[in-house]
Amino acid sequence: WITTYGYVENVAEGIALTIGNSRALKRVFNIGEVAPVNHLEWSRRIAEVLGWNGDIEISDDPTIEFAQRLSSLDLSVQFQIDSRRIREQLGFYETVTITDGLTRTAVDERVRG
């Protein structure tokens, strides 16, 4: 399943680009990463920034609670947006890389407990 994500500072930067900008008037802009990846790849990226070297296995075992919850979802529809308009028309780009954003999030989560 593919979902578009965006790190909060990057999204805020995109929103700031539209404020008071005549090129943004009456336009809708999507803000998100250029090339969204599936959730397995997201899991691998998170594991990497956490320094976790275990195996990630996909299972549809009905005795696993998480698999039970997933079985009720329609994951055939991808939630993937196209952010080309804000990039091409307003010059948006990510100032925080995906790896840095995940690392900052992991640090923040650890601090919060």
Regions found by a protein language model. Give the residues of each.
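Residues within well-ordered alpha-helical secondary structure of globular protein domains
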Residues: 17, 48, 92, 107-108
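Mid/C-terminal beta-alpha module of Rossmann-like enzyme folds, strongest
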Residues: 14-71
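Conserved C-terminal active-site "lid" loop/helix of NAD(P)H-dependent oxidoreductases
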Residues: 8, 64-93
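Amphipathic alpha-helical segment in the mid-to-C-terminal domain
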Residues: 8, 39, 94-98
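Non-catalytic, hydrophobic alpha-helical segments
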Residues: 11, 15, 31, 42, ...
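Glycine-rich "substrate-gating" loop/helix at the edge of Rossmann-like oxidoreductase active sites
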Residues: 1-9, 33-35
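Amphipathic terminal alpha-helices
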Residues: 97-113
